[in-house]
Regions:
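Hydrophobic membrane-insertion alpha-helices, especially the h-region
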Residues: 1-7
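Generic serine detector
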Residues: 7, 19-20, 41, 52, ...
Length: 157
């Protein structure tokens, strides 16, 4: 019984504000990465934001990658390290806590897309113009085991 109550892992839930039904539910391991990819609405250039979740369920931004600084983009003094990867500016080593956060999903064309374990889910196709909360939580070993047998209907792949 005690084993069922101990921590079994993490779960990231992406839920529209005002709803209890998640768009996505992602099982995660401590430190595992997920990415939000979209096209900047002003600059019309691709952006990648790489996030992680720690053992307590706190969300961090780890890296941002883009072609050029655009409106709302850019470096924060004292956070991360700016490098170039080909044509992209990349802020690495950020490990900046965001906690749970709200994202207003853009329209098709902005294509807010969640990338996780080789899957890509276009949030703009699922819920354009909706505000959604990204929230992570610890789950019990029994919950994790259950989800290994029967995945949540909102888990991609």
């Amino acid at each position: 019984m005690v084993a069922g109550l101990t921590s079994g892992g993490l779960e990231l839930r992406i839920v529209p504000l005002g709803s209890s039904r998640p768009l996505l539910v992602l099982p995660l391991e401590t430190g595992e990465l997920f990415t939000i990819h979209y096209v900047h609405s002003v600059e019309n250039a691709p952006i990648w934001e790489v996030h992680s979740v720690d053992a307590e369920g706190r969300i961090y931004i780890e890296e941002e990658r883009y072609r050029k600084f655009g409106a709302g983009m850019g470096r924060m003094p004292g956070v991360g390290r700016l490098v170039r990867r080909g044509e992209y500016e990349v802020i690495t080593d950020m490990h900046m806590p965001t906690g749970d956060f709200v994202l207003r999903i853009g329209s098709p064309g902005v294509d807010h897309t969640l990338v996780w374990r080789g899957t890509r889910t276009n949030l703009s196709a699922l819920a354009p113009h909706r505000a959604v909360r990204f929230a992570a939580r610890k789950v019990s070993f029994l919950h994790q085991l259950w989800r290994m047998v029967i995945s949540h209907g909102a888990t991609p792949g």
